[in-house]
Amino acid sequence: MNIEQIFKKPLKRNINGVVKAEQTDDASAYIELDEYVITRELENHLRHFFESYVPATGPERIRMENKIGVWVSGFFGSGKSHFIKILSYLLSNRKVTHNGTERNAYSFFEEKIKDALFLADINKAVHYPTEVILFNIDSRANVDDKEDAILKVFLKVFNERIGYCADFPHIAHLERELDKRGQYETFKAAFADINGSRWEDERDAYYFISDDMAQALSQATQQSLEASRQWVEQLDKNFPLDINNFCQWVKEWLDDNGKNILFMVDEVGQFIGKNTQMMLKLQTITENLGVICGGRAWVIVTSQADINAAIGGMSSRDGQDFSKIQGRFSTRLQLSSSNTSEVIQKRLLVKTDEAKAALAKVWQEKGDILRNQLAFDTTTTTALRPFTSEEEFVDNYPFVPWHYQILQKVFESIRTKGAAGKQLAMGERSQLEAFQTAAQQISAQGLDSLVPFWRFYAAIESFLEPAVSRTITQACQNGILDEFDGNLLKTLFLIRYVETLKSTLDNLVTLSIDRIDADKVELRRRVEKSLNTLERLMLIARVEDKYVFLTNEEKEIENEIRNVDVDFSAINKKLASIIFDDILKSRKYRYPANKQDFDISRFLNGHPLDGAVLNDLVVKILTPKDPTYSFYNSDATCRPYTSEGDGCILIRLPEEGRTWSDIDLVVQTEKFLKDNAGQRPEQATLLSEKARENSNREKLLRVQLESLLAEADVWAIGERLPKKSSTPSNIVDEACRYVIENTFGKLKMLRPFNGDISREIHALLTVENDTELDLGNLEESNPDAMREVETWISMNIEYNKPVYLRDILNHFARRPYGWPEDEVKLLVARLACKGKFSFSQQNNNVERKQAWELFNNSRRHSELRLHKVRRHDEAQVRKAAQTMADIAQQPFNEREEPALVEHIRQVFEEWKQELNVFRAKAEGGNNPGKNEIESGLRLLNAILNEKEDFALIEKVSSLKDELLDFSEDREDLVDFYRKQFATWQKLGAALNGSFKSNRSALEKDAAAVKALGELESIWQMPEPYKHLNRITLLIEQVQNVNHQLVEQHRQHALERIDARIEESRQRLLEAHATSELQNSVLLPMQKARKRAEVSQSIPEILAEQQETKALQMDADKKINLWIDELRKKQEAQLRAANEAKRAAESEQTYVVVEKPVIQPVPKKTHLVNVASEMRNATGGEVLETTEQVEKALDTLRTTLLAAIKAGDRIRLQ
């Protein structure tokens, strides 16, 4: 039995894989109905549709204006067109004849659907009178109609179905109008008589038969020939085409015929695309049909699920508009290809009973072999399973279950990547053809055969873009490739863009199996040979562990890449980046015994990567890319090489052809992409893909190099090292450890600190009191190492070489020490605490506490300089202590230099603070001791500014005499500013206060003059300290005289002031002044009196007295103004009374006119400046003659009498 004989239906029968909406002949319809497979998914969709549609059928049907739209969507090949075509057959209950037997569509579904209730719903729907119009909108539309295309197509197919003219809607409208009037048949008969042909045969050429039309129209309508001719001529102009009219015409037809009507429109989504106006037209047609026809006219459309993928170029707004249109369709069915295998099994792979038995036997004998043969590497694929049971094997043979999954991905990827035209679908219809074609190719083979994956290529070859198919055809015909090579190339093309299946060697072997018991080892060898051939011919490329089919354009790019010229330095740089940066990573080695980090100098193929200065550890890696690689291939050459100078580590990587060719390709590709960046916009996608491939190739190269490093031979300082690890970083670490332990002789001199070393350093440097330190413990903890560090620092300082912390750390980190940086810092800190060394930064001394920040900041290690500390012997310290005791008049018992210096600093700091307080007081006026204070501060600062203990004691000794003199001056300053300063301030206040202002009066008293003179003498003394005790008595003597004089002048002044105030008060009362006027006059005079009451200055008291006199004159002026106002008011009152009296007398009426009460107005005060009047009369200040005297007196008399006559009183000035 061969494969062709195992199928129930003929394998080579015609299966219409691509369904066309308008291919409805009986033969095609019968096959479609008979072979239509109702999968679980399709049954659910049918249920959903009929749940929506059935209520609109039957006598009790309900109105469904808003639910008459059905939107069927799915990807290419998901069966949308097939679904609505079968639905059209079913709803119209299409009758088909086959081999003389007639069947209706419903009868086919009785066999396919087992649910009786569901069948009853279908039966109800299909037996309701229904007109079904199925059409592909793209094939029926006229591109010139633009936005009206949707409406015109709907009208066209509707007119065509009911017998009217399809191509010319205005002709159809004429027919509709005649039909309404009952004149259509008469018109057709008249036309046949006149023209000799049937109307239906000639109407599409109505322009040529317009006269015959007019005559027939005249006869049918009984109107004149002229009127009929005009009607014909105006048909297209008077045609009222809009959506509302169309829906009304559909309603009229439904009313006349008592049917439902279904417009079933295929591929409407692609047709309207992103045309917003077409979207709105479809929406309006659907809505209006529902409302106007009362749910009897339905619109069922199909569309791509991903419309943007189908037409491209849709914006987000277009997508939103498209979604809104779909929302107007209440019933939405989304078809998928999830049941592709079920369709193919039922339509193509159903077996005969005999075949089932034979295949069952095959499974029983070779089931385990099949499972192993057809399994993929799970690390490189998603879940692609082989056969799992006998039933599955029988149902799918000669195919494997994963054929469905992979082929669907193949169709999808080829179409989306542009390798095929849009007619290639990715659902069951194209897969059905592919599976049939593949099975036919092995139809003559026995039941031990399987379908290798390349067999599917023939089914899609005709759909491919010519450039793609030509590449494969030419390669297979070039005479270099054999048949197997060509078939493998086809396989690689098919899975080129399938992401779920990596095209690795093992997976390609599985895809190439064509027999159940094929020798997989031999097949692998054959596949690998073909891959090498295809790669050499640049038909494919290897990317990581995958093999990738190359298009012509990709081959051109690949050829350009392989011809890119790259020099050795570029390759070496890339190798160094991968080996040292990506794999080994660290540039340091941490020695585990003391946690010390050692810098590594790195070399690759003889080229240094870290500059010319060598570190203590040197690692040299040699690869086959080095021209000297073959020379260093044995102990005889490698041992002496690694022993030269301070020695090094040599790592020699083994030869492995693929790795070293891959590094060339990586660098070539990088250079090619860099050189062509932005230069080839038409190849941007390909170049981007090349960049991605190269990135993946580099990742694989990293893995390969890591493996080679693990296998490499290692030599170190003249010895070949045994392999103790398989990890590259561990191999290098072991070699570094070997070098350190065999070349760092003083490494073990240092005993590592147990504990938090950073905290210990901080504690040592920031301790407040050195007495808290256990100096003995500092020495015992690491004596040899401390001695080594101290010796090296001291030796360099003796040679006048500046020593910085960075120098110390660098020296003891290198061979032969290798000491950790923190351990060396701890040793330096201990030496500083022992007083061996001090610190400075930029020529400024740095206290230990401040040094911690520099210790803790590696960037500032080169700023911290060390100095050897000088010390006095015990006798010198004792002498310095005695000197300080004499100076400070207090005991200094310290015998250690640091303690003595601390005591000196404490005393002098206190003196300095004291002097600063005295200076602040002295600066406030005429205070003694300013020079002594300033000289004392200069002296103390000169001592305190010495940062070294040794220098400070030397300074105290050299300034001993000055300090003793200052000590005596300080006693006077302390006594004055602490005890006598208040008395001195009192003296200053007296001399510069009342004594100064009243001096002229005081000088009239002899005792006061004498005391005042003595006080002023003391005030001017530079050192008045001995006379300070007399100040209080002398002040009291002057104060007593001053008080008597002040009170005498005060009494006299107050009497004068009071008299003036009282006089002004009386004048205000007489003038009946307001309170405001009284305040303005009296208040300033009263304030002057208060000032006179409290003032201790005689001139001030006399000034207040004179001020009161001036204020009295101002008061007179204000009162005079007030009197003038009073007089004006009284005169006005008198005038008013007199006018009233005269008016009464003139009118001879008896009216009593009251005289106003006139209060007496006081006299104004006239100010007369006697001296001024006399000067004006005589013209001078001096009177020399009797005549001048008489003239002056006459003038004064005239002025005074004039004032009296005016009723004023006179105040003389």
UniProtKB/Swiss-Prot annotation:
Role played: BREX systems (bacteriophage exclusion) provide immunity against bacteriophage. Part of a type 1 BREX system which protects against dsDNA phage. This system allows phage adsorption but prevents phage DNA replication, without degradation of the phage DNA. Methylation of bacterial DNA by PglX guides self/non-self discrimination.
Protein name according to UniProt: Probable ATP-binding protein BrxC
UniProt keyword list: Antiviral defense
Disruption phenotype: No methylation of 5'-GGTAAG-3' in chromosomal DNA, BREX no longer confers phage resistance.
Induction line: Transcribed at slowly increasing levels as cells progress from lag to exponential to stationary phase.
Tree of life domain: Bacteria
Organism, scientific name: Escherichia coli O9:H4 (strain HS)
A biological-process GO annotation: defense response to virus
Keyword Repeat on entry: no
Entry keyword Electron transport: no
Annotated family: Belongs to the BrxC family.
